[in-house]
């Protein structure tokens, strides 16, 4: 599923949005409208296994795994660049989307004029932290593991300190689903490459 926010008379640029895990691109409507006001056309897709792209088990990337999701992000960026010649293309990527963006930049950084990574980290560090917090028979599973150390009003307090935003996430039927067993290992499979200095050297120097 794709989304377009193009209520812009004289565009100054194009923004591609890559959303996070267990959510969907429609949640970025408020951001997209603000970017429209600033002169940017905004495009987004629901990743494999997410939002309106769910065709089976929610969160399932399919047999091709996380690498296919990364390829989707890169291909969508290329299509947007071709559809908007002469306009600078920017990538805004959140959480899981930011991990995909990190991979995309290893091979396709030239197509972007700037990148914003939100709610991001180094995959290797995140994997270690999740493993450390998931020890013992009473350890939380899935997204609940992120809420360790936070209050337990909904179980999703780790998302935001804004209770209204947390409540909106909890109420959204396309958000917060349990992750398939294969999803997390697939996500962290790219950690080694993303931490490799020789791979990082391929990113365009000076990319904002």
Question: Model features per residue range: what roles?
Answer:
Residues 84-95:
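Alpha/beta-hydrolase fold nucleophile elbow
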């Amino acid at each position: 599923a794709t989304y377009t926010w193009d209520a812009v008379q004289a565009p100054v640029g194009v923004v591609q949005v890559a959303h996070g895990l267990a959510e969907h691109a429609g949640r970025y409507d408020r951001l997209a409208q603000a970017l429209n006001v600033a002169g940017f056309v905004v495009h987004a897709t629901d990743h494999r296994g997410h939002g309106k792209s769910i065709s089976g088990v929610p969160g399932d990337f399919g047999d091709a795994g996380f690498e296919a999701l990364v390829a989707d992000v890169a291909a969508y960026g290329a299509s947007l660049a071709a559809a908007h010649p002469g306009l600078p293309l920017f990538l805004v990527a959140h959480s899981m989307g930011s991990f995909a963006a990190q991979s995309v930049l290893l091979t396709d950084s030239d197509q972007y004029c700037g990148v914003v990574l939100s709610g991001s980290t180094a995959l290797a560090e995140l994997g270690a932290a999740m493993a450390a917090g998931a020890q013992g028979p009473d350890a939380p599973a899935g997204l609940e593991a992120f809420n360790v150390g936070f209050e337990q009003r909904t179980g999703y307090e780790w998302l935001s300190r804004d209770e209204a935003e947390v409540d909106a996430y909890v109420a959204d039927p396309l958000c917060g689903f349990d992750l398939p067993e294969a999803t997390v290992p697939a996500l962290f499979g790219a950690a080694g490459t993303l931490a490799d200095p020789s791979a990082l050297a391929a990113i365009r120097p000076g990319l904002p």
